[in-house]
Amino acid sequence: MSLDLDQVVVDAQNAFASVEDNASLENEKARFLGKSGVLTDLLKGLGKLDPETRKTEGARINQAKSRVEEALTARRQALADALMNARLAAEAIDVTLPGRDVAEGSLHPVMNTWERVAKIFGSIGFDVADGPEIESDWMNFTALNNPDNHPARSMQDTFYIDGRDSEDKLLLLRTHTSPMQVRYARMHVEKYKHLDRIPPIKVIAPGRTYRVDSDATHSPMFHQVEGLWIADNISFADLKGVYTDFLRNFFERDDIQVRFRPSYFPFTEPSAEIDMAFGNGKWLEISGSGQVHPTVVRNMGLDPERYIGFAFGSGLERLTMLRYGINDLRLFFEGDVRFLRQFA
């Protein structure tokens, strides 16, 4: 028992401190504390000593063993801490770095136009109304003074639906937003029927419409905005002023030139196509319009001898194409994100 126990402890501490992984640490543990380890051999040799010496040396060996075990535990904890710190460093986030942009959606360009049109007309006192896309043949055609033999009523131009409404009238996908003229006016008249004179009707009705047509400038589903202003003293001059002001606001130009070209629509009399001047002396049709036909006024529940007004209908796709310089209507419906992202 001449071995220097303090030196054994120091050797164990140095051995444990020099290893960099748990496997090596276990090897060093076996060298000092294993079945054939230095301290284990010393404990086995105590049996050869006399009782008094065995007691003294046993206490010294156990004390040294405790110090070695403490060094072993400390090194294990140090290796575990180092491993955790390495993992944390590898997964660390630099909070000073700029964040990643979250991909945001945006309105479709046609819907942008929809909202822009509604905002412009809303600023001059027009209500915004919505109506059903499935209409009766009567509301879509008859109420708007379309004769029974009008070509628009044919299945080559209109999507008819199986079944009939509660009044046994044919059903179809509306071919224009004009039925909202009659629907909104009737609600307005019902609301104010207790008055001697019905207040002015000022409304636009943007929405989806359907026709059997498809090419670079036509789609079987497209968007229109209908406009209506009826009172007791509305003239064609009001129509020209309102629509010209709308175009100047929509295109953000004060030099816009507009002309009203005589035309024919069953629901207006007189009727006019509204054209807008573009470069090189060219004119492009923007809208159909006119003074509301007396028959239509009557179908609204109003007396055409007392009330008069104007109506117009414009394609939202066409307005969008002109504003952004797009020459193919089909681009709006192909869902190409590269195209749509330009208008975000």
From Swiss-Prot:
Residue stretches spanning the membrane: none
Highest taxon of the lineage: Bacteria
Compartments it resides in: Cytoplasm
Catalytic activity line of the entry: tRNA(Phe) + L-phenylalanine + ATP = L-phenylalanyl-tRNA(Phe) + AMP + diphosphate + H(+)
Broad EC category: ligase
Names of the cofactor(s): Mg(2+)
Keyword hit for Zinc-finger: no
Cofactor note: Binds 2 magnesium ions per tetramer.
Major place of residence: cytoplasm
UniProt GO molecular function: ATP binding; magnesium ion binding; phenylalanine-tRNA ligase activity; tRNA binding
Listed Pfam families: Phe_tRNA-synt_N, tRNA-synt_2d
Classification via InterPro entries: aa-tRNA-synth_II, aa-tRNA-synth_II/BPL/LPL, Phe-tRNA-synth_IIc_asu, Phe-tRNA_ligase_II_N, Phe_tRNA_ligase_alpha1_bac, Phenylalanyl-tRNA_Synthase, tRNA-bd_arm
Residues where Mg(2+) binds: E269
Presence of keyword Mitochondrion: no
The enzyme's E.C. designation: 6.1.1.20
GO cellular component: cytoplasm
UniProt subunit comment: Tetramer of two alpha and two beta subunits.
Family per similarity comment: Belongs to the class-II aminoacyl-tRNA synthetase family. Phe-tRNA synthetase alpha subunit type 1 subfamily.
HAMAP family, sorted: Phe_tRNA_synth_alpha1
PANTHER family reported in the protein's UniProt record: PHENYLALANINE--TRNA LIGASE, MITOCHONDRIAL, PHENYLALANYL-TRNA SYNTHETASE
Name of this protein: Phenylalanine--tRNA ligase alpha subunit
Organism of this sequence: Ralstonia pickettii (strain 12J)
The gene coding this protein: pheS
